[in-house]
Amino acid sequence: LGAYNVGPLSGIYCATKHAVKAISETLAQEVKAFGIHVTDVKPGFMKTEFFGSSHKTTAPEGSPYKHLYDENMKFYMGQNGNQAGDPKKAAKLYIKVAEMDAPYESLPMGTDCCDGIRDICEGTVKLMEKMRSVAETTNF
């Protein structure tokens, strides 16, 4: 979901997700003629320790970003153990897709991922409709 959604203090994480998405889509176009398929996997929140022990950090004392850090940590800790995604089912789906003759180009995993991407895309469409008249002022 980080390839579509960004948040405070997650710039580098989300940038890597954007990069994987762009590289996957580009690579898929480049190798299609060779019969090679590329699938961009987008896992939603899986019930792992991603929001648990891997997030046991603290904000530096006096950091002007401490409030953002605290908000993020509250979110992460609220998610920990409550993720809807089953990593074992995700692993089985990875294998199933890898064995397909024509695998999916994009593989969102989990309803949270599908719903999140849909909501973000709908927001982008609304923004483009709103900004259309401004954008066209740069046309010849």
Model-derived features: where do they sit?
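Active-site-adjacent segment of SDR/Rossmann-fold oxidoreductases
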Residues: 5, 26-37
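Core catalytic loop region at the nicotinamide-binding pocket of NAD(P)H-dependent oxidoreductases
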Residues: 38, 81-119
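Non-catalytic terminal and boundary segments that flank Rossmann-like NAD(P)-dependent oxidoreductase
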Residues: 126-140
